[in-house]
Amino acid sequence: MENLTPRQIVEYLDKYIIGQEAAKKAVAVALRNRYRRKLLPPHLKDEIIPKNILMIGPTGVGKTEIARRLAKLIKAPFVKVEATKFTEVGYVGRDVEGMIRDLVETSLRMVREEKIKMVEDKAYNLAVERLSEIMIPNPKKENIKNPFEMFFGGIREDAAKTDPAYDELNYRRRELQDKIKKGFLDNEMVEIEVEEQKTPMVEVFGVGGIEEMGLNFQDILGGLIPPRRKKRRVTVKEALKILTQQEAQKLIDMDEVQREAIKRAEEDGIVFLDEIDKIASTGNTHGPDVSRGGVQRDILPIVEGSTVLTKYGPVKTDHILFIAAGAFHMSKPSDLIPELQGRFPIRVELKSLTVEDFKKILTVPENALTKQYVELLATEGVNLKFTEDSLEEIAKMAYTVNERNENIGARRLITILEKVLEDLSFNAPEMWGQTVVIDRKFVQDKLSEIVHDSDLSRYIL
């Protein structure tokens, strides 16, 4: 996925997001520039910083979805945060550096999963071996009565390995391992030892606790206090899953995982900063605006490049791509502090959705809403079909309600479709084998009264 061209990235985004070509092009170019930067000599590589993007547009038009799909495409660490969750240093709330710690945690989880996948087969074989030893344990050792035998215990053990009984034990275990692998014993019960989940410590440091300082007392004390183990009775299938995870954990080098996670967060990380318009000052210098300005000033050093301390080590934010988004109904991008405006040089405006866009959203994307409902009801044996005129009617109604009430973009389609299919979803278990066709009349019967009554539509749709 490294060397995708901007055109290929836009084509991929087209499968899931309708319209918004300008925004798609902007993120595609930003992504390609990352690839280009990696090909440069080291002295130039450090000089080139990512061009952060500011997306301006109403809710439900695809701002978050573009960033989320992009991160999924390139398998990059991605974190979405709301700017309103953060507070200025000295106020109760989350510290802005928390977004970088979240990014590193996401990156660590991704790298760990990749490493575990690489050792999965080996871990599985070790788990099968361990499970066979639990199910057919070694015979209990005899009590040593003669003190001299204590000095020659090693000789006794070696002698035991050449004992015919030992060969018999190994043969039985190999047979058992074969049955475990073939799944013959999946529902058998077995008792295994598992580590107890650590109970969270009492939080004394307010919101965010000591995590905000990049410390974790449980990790510090982990080496001093051995983990407690408890016995659990589970099926062989479940035991195999637990033991495979334990064995995989032993096979991977966590120091290497942490180093790679930090590097990936620094080089490929994407932070999606939503609701940035809500922290824009509207001209007042008192009340909540004071704190808003403080949050902007706190975000500034992170966006322009600084070092954030995390429990896995220091993380440089110089090459992390920041995508900010906001509706800017009550404020303008120029209401942000000038320094922060300058850190988002690429600005793209996302357009409000038209009736035609709504219709495409219902059918074109790979995860289109109508396809989801067809598949959901197919599990109950109901064959659901949407006619062309029904899709036009749903799109028209979604647009009308958005214009009349609050404009929530494509999310309005979910509300309307739920209302249209409410009775059908309820009765589906008793309709096995039936075909239901949703046409214009069906949609109008369910919704026309609600849509045309502005008071009703405000509460129901």
UniProtKB/Swiss-Prot annotation:
Gene3D superfamilies, sorted: 1.10.8.60, DNA helicase RuvA subunit, C-terminal domain, P-loop containing nucleotide triphosphate hydrolases
Record key words, sorted: ATP-binding, Chaperone, Cytoplasm, Nucleotide-binding, Stress response
TM annotation in the entry: none
Residues the record lists as binding ATP: I18, G60, V61, G62, K63, T64, E65, D274, E339, R411
One Gene Ontology molecular-function label: ATP hydrolysis activity
GO biological process: protein unfolding; proteolysis involved in protein catabolic process
Places the protein is found: Cytoplasm
Main location: cytoplasm
GO cellular component terms, semicolon-separated: HslUV protease complex
Domain of life: Bacteria
Pfam families cross-referenced by the UniProt entry: AAA, AAA_2
Complex and partners: A double ring-shaped homohexamer of HslV is capped on each side by a ring-shaped HslU homohexamer. The assembly of the HslU/HslV complex is dependent on binding of ATP.
Role summary: ATPase subunit of a proteasome-like degradation complex; this subunit has chaperone activity. The binding of ATP and its subsequent hydrolysis by HslU are essential for unfolding of protein substrates subsequently hydrolyzed by HslV. HslU recognizes the N-terminal part of its protein substrates and unfolds these before they are guided to HslV for hydrolysis.
Family under the similarity heading: Belongs to the ClpX chaperone family. HslU subfamily.
UniProt-recorded name of the protein: ATP-dependent protease ATPase subunit HslU
Lineage: Bacteria, Bacillati, Bacillota, Clostridia, Thermoanaerobacterales
Gene: hslU
